[in-house]
């Protein structure tokens, strides 16, 4: 069986199909895939906390960095992940796709304390994971997700439902490009 590559793709929750509250009206960036597992971050679900709250909780001086803490997914919700442009790195940074990288260490918060930050970023708690067959079933059998190649703007220029709507529009545009 051929392995679908979802790495670097966006999953856009289809309206009226995705009923899981973690993923309804969500935009998920799949940044890593093995032959068994896909790992991604929900991009458009801010929590009630902000970056300053997290810095204070972790004993790091509040840098004044503005921004929500986003819910990256229901797995490892105590873990912090920084999705950011690849113009910056920390001790545990991995290159992703589309000019993005992912960092996940305490040093990233300390760097932010000293205004050493990437051009664009989102701080996430948790991540989203699927077994590859599970994700394939959600996409092809249950038709719960639109799968689309992202553009750079969608990662950082929208928020909440606006980001989901931008994802729907991007998927529609890409489909129209294929048809005409």
How would you label these PLM feature ranges?
Residues 1-180:
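A short aromatic-anchored loop/beta-hairpin motif
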């Amino acid at each position: 069986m051929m392995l679908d590559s979802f790495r670097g793709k966006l999953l856009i929750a289809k309206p009226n199909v995705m009923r899981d509250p973690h993923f309804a009206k969500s935009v998920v960036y799949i940044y890593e895939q093995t032959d068994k597992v896909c790992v991604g971050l929900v991009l458009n679900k801010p929590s009630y906390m902000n970056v300053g709250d997290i810095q204070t909780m972790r004993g790091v001086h509040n840098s004044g960095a503005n921004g929500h803490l986003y819910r990256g997914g229901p797995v490892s919700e105590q873990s912090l992940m920084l999705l950011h442009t690849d113009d910056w790195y920390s001790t545990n940074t991995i290159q992703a796709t589309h000019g993005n990288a992912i960092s996940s260490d305490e040093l990233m918060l300390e760097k932010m304390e000293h205004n050493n930050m990437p051009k664009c970023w989102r701080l996430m708690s948790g991540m989203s994971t699927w077994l590859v067959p599970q994700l394939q079933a959600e996409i092809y059998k249950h038709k719960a997700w639109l799968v689309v190649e992202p553009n750079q703007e969608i990662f950082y220029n929208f928020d909440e439902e606006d980001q989901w709507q931008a994802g729907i529009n991007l998927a529609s545009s890409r489909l129209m490009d294929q048809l005409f």
